[in-house]
Amino acid sequence: MSLIEFPLLDQTSSNSVISTTPNDLSNWSRLSSLWPLLYGTSCCFIEFASLIGSRFDFDRYGLVPRSSPRQADLILTAGTVTMKMAPSLVRLYEQMPEPKYVIAMGACTITGGMFSTDSYSTVRGVDKLIPVDVYLPGCPPKPEAVIDALTKLRKKISREIVEDRIRSQNKNRCFTTSHKLYVRRSTHTGTYEQELLYQSPSTLDISSENFYKSKSIVPSYKLVN
């Protein structure tokens, strides 16, 4: 039985027999029924939106976009992923039923892009959060490249073995030590001026009386010049 195309039946015989395995049958049934969860945060997602039109017509691949992770088996991440949205992305991935797949679309999703050099809040690769099946580089990738990534994912599904998929999910994932989520007290207290006026004496180098006294001695025009 062909893993991607339909099996060629014997046209000369009325009693054709198709032999396959449950694993191959399961893979074949999922090739043209991928339901993606679209997770776009930047300009790369605009290129994916053009696939909905009649020029590329991504419906021919059986893609049905879903807004709920519980009904999707493919999540397509496009754009920058920040540390603040990282827990939400992981939660969406965990809510997806098995088997599930991930396509990382664009340089910002794969490596952090131009924000990965000096940004303190950008995740340098979505594969640090969730396992990625297909990497789609580009800034942004063209719609033809997205179709090619979907084709490669379908080929991967056709050769998939259930035992290997379960074994790969049980492995421990490593995270970079420079990107960790710390729980901190909120700094938005609304008492910014009060904190400056009512500092403890131990934190001040000079007393408030000497400060205002020295400030009144220096003329304002000397401070400007």
Swiss-Prot record:
Entry's localization field: Plastid, Chloroplast thylakoid membrane
GO BP, sorted A to Z: aerobic respiration; electron transport coupled proton transport; photosynthesis, light reaction
SUPFAM superfamilies reported in the protein's UniProt record: HydA/Nqo6-like
Catalytic activity, as annotated: a plastoquinone + NADH + (n+1) H(+)(in) = a plastoquinol + NAD(+) + n H(+)(out); a plastoquinone + NADPH + (n+1) H(+)(in) = a plastoquinol + NADP(+) + n H(+)(out)
UniProt keywords, alphabetically: 4Fe-4S, Chloroplast, Iron, Iron-sulfur, Membrane, Metal-binding, NAD, NADP, Plastid, Plastoquinone, Quinone, Thylakoid, Translocase, Transport
Ligand binding ([4Fe-4S] cluster): 43-44, 108, 139
Domain of life: Eukaryota
InterPro entries: NADH_UbQ_OxRdtase-like_20kDa (IPR006137), NADH_UQ_OxRdtase_20Kd_su (IPR006138)
PROSITE patterns, per database record: COMPLEX1_20K
Subunit composition and interactions: NDH is composed of at least 16 different subunits, 5 of which are encoded in the nucleus.
HAMAP family, A to Z: NDH1_NuoB (MF_01356)
Family, similarity comment: Belongs to the complex I 20 kDa subunit family.
This protein's name: NAD(P)H-quinone oxidoreductase subunit K, chloroplastic
